[in-house]
């Protein structure tokens, strides 16, 4: 029997954070600019959310939209963001980086993870843009400090990627928490939870509509 479902809600405002908690979210992922799939939030928003919200909060570290290939100035910016979040007492960040060939950027990922310690790290859906996900997750498994992977199985949503997500869980479920993402809502969560062998799911509307 699987453990109780953990519903992780991605939000980009304090009002959404409060509403998600009220609706029964188990954990939040705080971002800005969800229309760009989530960027590093404003520090004032981070402070307000971690001061106000009682459930666990992860914070996105992603300096811009678009691809996950970063130049030196962007790397410097993200390193400083990691430092600041750690100094604020954030418990976990969400980040990820790829090379121009869409492989895991091992050097940058390791740098960010080591800099983040003792914060936990979730590698985000950048993994879905890699060519051989199982091979690339095997590379991630050798980077100490990454405890979770957020994925739609390389598909446009969790339902279509369910088989690949299950393959990832079968191979790496003892190493990582695998969080299924991609159009997961309160309306399809029960069905997805029977199809995908994880108890952790992520979505904007996983506990309902947050627009007040």
Predicted regions and their residues:
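Hydrophobic faces of well-ordered beta-strands that scaffold small-molecule active sites
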Residues: 5-11, 28-30, 57-61, 93-95, ...
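N-terminal beta1-alpha1 ligand-phosphate binding loop
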Residues: 6-19, 23-38
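Catalytic cores of alpha/beta
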Residues: 12-23, 59, 63, 69-84, ...
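Glycine-rich phosphate-binding active-site loops on the catalytic face of alpha/beta enzymes
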Residues: 26-39, 84, 88-101, 144-159, ...
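Alpha-helix N-cap and loop-to-helix initiation/capping positions
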Residues: 37-45, 70-80, 100-108, 132, ...
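Alpha-helix-loop-beta-strand connector modules within alpha/beta enzyme cores
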Residues: 38-65, 106-126, 162-185
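Hydrophobic, well-structured mid-protein blocks that either form specific transmembrane helices
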Residues: 82-131
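Histidine/lysine/aspartate-rich catalytic loop segments that bind and position anionic ligands
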Residues: 118-157
